[in-house]
Amino acid sequence: MPPPLASTTSSFASDGENYLGPVSATPHLMCERIVDAILPSSLPKGHHRRDERKKDIEVFDIGCNDARVLITACQKYKNVRGVGIEIDPVAANNARNNVRNSKLENRIEIREQDAMTVTDVHRAEYIFLYLLPKGNEKIEKILRERMNDRCRIVCYMFKLPDRLEDDKFWSKRLIKEVAFDDSRKRERKGVDTSRYNRIYVYGSKREMERREKIRKIVRAGVGVAIGIVLRNSMLK
């Protein structure tokens, strides 16, 4: 049985200063795709026994609704621990019940909390966001200030915005954008309104530094190769 869906309308005023968007659950098929995008495939799979030789991976879901993304991640990978932040009390209660029913209480923590007041986001190595553009605009400031150098972020549906045109902080970190024709496993024929649903993957600071080093090595290698070709052509 899939986890119950929380109400689609938040019980908090939509014009509040820290309002990030309505309560809305990620489709189950997209949960699987998001987990595959956010976590390395080298992690030990299965959720019954941890691999003591591997360190735990901290995943934060900001606006976690009924915790289905965190549950999917912990069920697929042994060494994943999750923290779900949810301001809506109904959704937070559903999340706790789903975590309990999945027997993952020792690995997933659900907080009924305003996401703008989270002070330990620096613990996260992976962060998932399914927020409206206005919500992404608000939360990105906190992520910039508090996330650690190893943190990778995955957004569903909407990108993280750059603050200024000449800033391009998030645009530079966008390493993957994947579009999916269907967000649900469909048992009946019908019109799918989710043809443009996308996942946006943002690399960590360390990832970007490694990529830049590789680019420099490749450029240097190409330069050397061109130099050799030119020199040989001149000797002929």
Functional labels for PLM-detected ranges:
Residues 68-78:
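Conserved SAM-binding loop of SAM-dependent methyltransferases across substrates and taxa
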Residues 88:
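Conserved SAM/SAH-binding beta-strand->alpha-helix loop
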Residues 1-46, 53, 57:
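S-adenosyl-L-methionine
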Residues 95:
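Conserved SAM-binding loop
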